[in-house]
């Protein structure tokens, strides 16, 4: 289990993370999403023990990660720009990791090198961006760390490689690996993650199991005999509100039965609850925060 407790982090007097609290269950895949500059990469560096929290703590199975080799040996972090020795081949990087990770599985390594069609004698510096990421995935899956942290996991991967990677991650979860993935590709995250957190201005505005989140965020289309204004619905927790004449499309947080009971007081001639996906949830949350590009 990972516990992020009241974490604060600032750079040059600017708060990047502000009293952040999140718990991530063991053996799960947690999707970390948010706009640019929200603090996602900063949080991943703190989780990896590279940086220290200004306040609060980050615990892995009850142990603080910062300057704790016993914890950090169970964590592998793949950044948005993975590091390799400049002239190294993937086989040379494999030999390097073998010295630090005794559990490194050569059979697994060869399987993914073959699956990803990675040239083993070609310097990694000559790989494409997508191939470099695939190479790091092959090494990571062979190491099989207890905790895997991924920044922009799907960036540079073609659809076939994305599918192969998602299948590999699901197999590792069956062995109780815990994965945190930061990505702008929300549709990919929705396919693979158990739970999510939306990070905005250093705070987690929404977090939890995807199905629980969907149970409390609803897209509703209504039609009325007469025009109504947004103020009529002030008793609801409205994330998004769009009106076109007598037709209203809104996104509302809360218990759906209570919401429908309240809306029926206005005698709609149509009331329909529509399915909502993760990308829409993110957009509606950002719209409420004033990101007008989503209008």
Regions found by a protein language model. Give the residues of each.
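C-terminal coupling/interaction segments
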Residues: 251-295
């Amino acid at each position: 289990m990972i516990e992020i407790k009241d974490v604060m982090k600032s750079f040059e007097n600017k708060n990047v993370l502000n009293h952040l609290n999140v718990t991530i269950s063991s053996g799960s895949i947690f999707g970390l999403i948010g706009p640019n500059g929200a603090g996602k990469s900063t949080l991943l560096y703190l989780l990896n023990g590279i940086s220290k929290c200004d306040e609060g703590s980050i615990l892995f199975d009850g142990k603080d990660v910062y300057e704790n080799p016993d914890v950090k040996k169970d964590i592998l972090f793949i950044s948005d720009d993975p590091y390799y020795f400049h002239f190294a081949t993937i086989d040379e990087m494999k030999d390097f990791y073998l010295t630090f990770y005794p559990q490194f599985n050569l059979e697994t390594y060869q399987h993914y090198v073959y699956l990803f069609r990675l040239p083993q004698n070609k310097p990694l510096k000559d790989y494409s961006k997508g191939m470099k990421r695939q190479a790091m995935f092959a090494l990571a899956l062979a190491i099989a760390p207890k905790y895997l942290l991924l920044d922009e996991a799907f960036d540079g991967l073609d659809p076939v490689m994305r599918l192969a990677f998602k299948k590999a991650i699901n197999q590792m979860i069956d062995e109780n690996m815990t994965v945190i993935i930061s990505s702008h590709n929300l549709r990919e995250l929705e396919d693979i993650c158990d739970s999510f957190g939306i990070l905005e201005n250093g705070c987690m505005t929404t977090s939890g199991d995807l199905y629980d989140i969907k149970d409390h965020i609803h897209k509703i289309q209504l039609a009325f005999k007469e025009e109504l204004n947004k103020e009529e619905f002030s008793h609801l927790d409205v994330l998004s509100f769009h009106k076109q004449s007598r037709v209203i499309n809104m996104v509302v947080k809360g218990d759906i039965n209570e919401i429908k009971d309240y809306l029926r007081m206005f005698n709609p001639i149509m009331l329909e609850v529509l399915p909502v996906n993760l990308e829409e949830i993110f957009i509606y949350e950002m719209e409420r925060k004033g990101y007008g590009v989503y209008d």
